Amino acid sequence: MSVPNVDPSHQSNASANEATRPSPAAEGLDKSGERVREMFRQIAPRYDVMNHLLSLNIDKWWRRKAVQTLKIKGDDPILDLCCGTGDLAIAIADSAGSDVQVIGSDFCHAMLEIARVKESKRTRDTAGGSGRHTIPFLEADSMALPFDDDAFQCVTVAFGLRNIADTDQGLSEMARVCKPGGQVLVLEFSQPTLPVLKQAYNFYFRHVLPRIGQWMARNDKSAYEYLPESVGKFPCGDALAGRMRDVGLQHVTFRPLTLGVATIYVGEKPGGKTDHAEMAAHREREALVAT
């Protein structure tokens, strides 16, 4: 098994890189790196509870569905970026088996500290960690990942893409570090497809959740306003699938979950064995037509 090289200069500059990047005006939110990092630093101890509130406690099932979507082959490593407190990375590691190295990256140190505690407990509880890779959780800029091109068989992100200052740059980096033929997977909140549910969910987001946030929050009330707003303004469905295609991914599909409250998007990086087989078959068909 090969473990991707990490460029320490990228890792050490993660905070500076994201802090100085401007926020795109198109989505109408201040997603500058310093603002988002500080927000997540403040809510890190309650982040898991926040996700349960946002998802009405269905987020664990969504993650299981995301893991089941991955086509894990051989022992090539897997990257989960914007990993937060580590739930998806740990779920992937539990599913992938002991031969596959899973790596988590995030730009918020406080979130990574919680992920490391979870990982330490996981390795203790599973046969003492015998024969099992420990997940390294690295502080890194998702718009300038410190990994070589074509390093991972799968690159994933759950509930984090909408928080990257430049969505397209984040997707581009995911595609860059993915191996040809590998998968890029996004699990993200989206807009419910059923009109009645959409109306109820929007009411929950705009009126119920902020009140819960005010009760839970101390100095971080803005986080409980930003997170629902970021969901409402983030592209979903065909719009996000199109942006995945724009960064060079192919065979992009998406699957709404829980009537569209969340969606799994999957794309493939061109250049894998399947592509070569398809090209060979195409050439054979052309040769037959020519004769």
Swiss-Prot record:
GO terms for MF: demethylmenaquinone methyltransferase activity; methyltransferase activity
Keywords: Menaquinone biosynthesis, Methyltransferase, S-adenosyl-L-methionine, Transferase
One protein family per Pfam: Ubie_methyltran
InterPro entries with a match to the protein in the record: SAM-dependent_MTases_sf (IPR029063), UbiE/COQ5_MeTrFase (IPR004033), UbiE/COQ5_MeTrFase_CS (IPR023576)
Reaction catalysis annotation: a 2-demethylmenaquinol + S-adenosyl-L-methionine = a menaquinol + S-adenosyl-L-homocysteine + H(+)
Biased composition (Polar residues): 8-20
Enzyme class: transferase
Metabolic or biological pathway: Quinol/quinone metabolism; menaquinone biosynthesis; menaquinol from 1,4-dihydroxy-2-naphthoate: step 2/2
Coiled coil: none
E.C. number(s) listed in UniProt: 2.1.1.163
Binding site for S-adenosyl-L-methionine: T85, D106, D141, S142
Disulfide bonds: none
Superkingdom field: Bacteria
UniProt family annotation: Belongs to the class I-like SAM-binding methyltransferase superfamily. MenG/UbiE family.
Protein name: Demethylmenaquinone methyltransferase
Organism: Rhodopirellula baltica (strain DSM 10527 / NCIMB 13988 / SH1)
